[in-house]
């Protein structure tokens, strides 16, 4: 089933290639389909290992899957080769910047607000150390400091949540930022060779009566 999964995702890559040719621009998430496919399947040995297991379990299914992968790879390569100039100029950096910069700015703003509240709370705590707990000033500051602390804790929780999201998006962006379409082309060439080799091997085994 691993090869079928690859084929399904390659078909989505092919669809987006055609869209890119037409529009010359894709969303951040659509661009991630390209880099995600490459990073998830660049270990080509995993395809070979999956094929070897499938050959023992169900060679007929493997043959069907290999043919589907070979066809999808052929479509990719035909599209790539006929529009190579467009794909050579592929540059995901602007869309990455448009995606990540606002998130970075949002996190910095929330983190700064939280730090200012903590600073204010710390200053009030220091001031309270020099006051008599029975004084009205102390009680007033104590009440205010509790309110400031509560606001800080809420802002800090918001800051932590924003940071987790920002970090996750930054990791996605890092994989895409310097991605080049040629990486995908080289990977698909290797995938097609493997798929065609699987087809040939199964046909030979059939002719020899071994399966």
Feature names for model-found ranges:
Residues 137-211:
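Long amphipathic all-alpha helical oligomerization modules
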Residues 125, 129, 133-136:
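Short helix-loop boundary/capping segments
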Residues 29, 75-78, 201:
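Long, compositionally biased alpha-helical segments
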Residues 51, 58, 69, 73-102:
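Short, charge-rich amphipathic alpha-helices with coiled-coil/heptad character
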Residues 44-57, 76-79, 83, 106-114, ...:
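Amphipathic alpha-helical coiled-coil segments
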